Amino acid sequence: FVLIQRWLCGKDGTYMTMLIDGKAISMQIKDELKQKAAELKAKGINVTLAVIQVGDNPASCVYVRNKKKGCGYIGIGSLSYELPEETSQEELLNLIRELNERDDVNGILVQLPLPSHIDEDTVIKAIDPLKDVDGFHPQSVGALCIGQSGFVSCTPAGIIQLLKRSNIDIAGKECVVLGRSNIVGKPMSLLLLRENATVTIAHSRTKNLKEVTQRADILVAAVGKPKMITKDYVKKGVVVVDVGINRDENNKLCGDVDFDDVEPVCSAITPVPGGVGPMTIAMLLHNCIESVSLKV
Ligand code: GUN
């Protein structure tokens, strides 16, 4: 026991912190999916993802390019629809209806954000839940909530994989999710609950936030505030998952967690970049492969 304790805690009580390598884990998943795609191809099943982008938001361009690159890497097809900013909602809905009908399209992804004249909820709802590889359709979210089969939002699904593949137990743990967005916070809390954690969702109106986050065995930060989480928000030995992608005062990429401050007291932590980020695409590709067999 003493040896294990010595390994876990340094002389000054700091931890031997495990750095959770999202790049390596996402690569492992992509290689597994590559194998699955080849097996499907051998059976004559070709998987294709349709990616729709409206306008040319620079961040969206990068994400969309990487998603198509990911398809190429695992050996599935991708169709690309780059529509001008002034595309009407009706035109976009017509394209989605056409792709819903096509037997040679397995997944449909509409990159967000959309221009302000298009209603995102209406667009998401138009996607066939059987092709909703982003897991944003109300039917997909509802299915997740009541434990039925359906696509799961990629970033939170990726975080579960990061934890599992790093041998971090979730069952029975106190998990605090900071942030309540539809894309991350809400599905994250539902997934942790499905893994039998005790889950608290904290947000901008939470009182005594530090007291709440200090309870966490696993803390997931998804608030979009650069370096907000310092060591006084956490207890010793916490596992910290940082979903934030922000720029600090020097325009350097940083997360919602002040990594240098928090890292010494964690048992495990995800870096930014190279933590959660690469997992989103891996899980999107996972959903594309799953679309072949999913029944909703
Ligand atoms: N914009 C930011 N993240 C995402 C995502 O996961 N999916 C889509 N479609 N758009 C996004």
Language model segments and positions:
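Rossmann-fold NAD(P)-binding glycine/threonine-rich loop
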Residues: 123, 244-294
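Positively charged, low-complexity intrinsically disordered leader regions
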Residues: 16-45
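Short beta-strand elements in bilobed, periplasmic/extracellular small-molecule ligand-binding domains
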Residues: 71-85, 199-201
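Glycine-rich phosphate-binding loop
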Residues: 104-115, 119-122, 216-248
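Short, well-structured alpha-helical segments in soluble
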Residues: 91-103
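Anion-binding alpha/beta catalytic cores of soluble intermediary-metabolism enzymes, centered on
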Residues: 109-170
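Glycine-rich phosphate/diphosphate-binding loop of Rossmann-like nucleotide-binding domains
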Residues: 54-68, 150-233, 239, 254-257
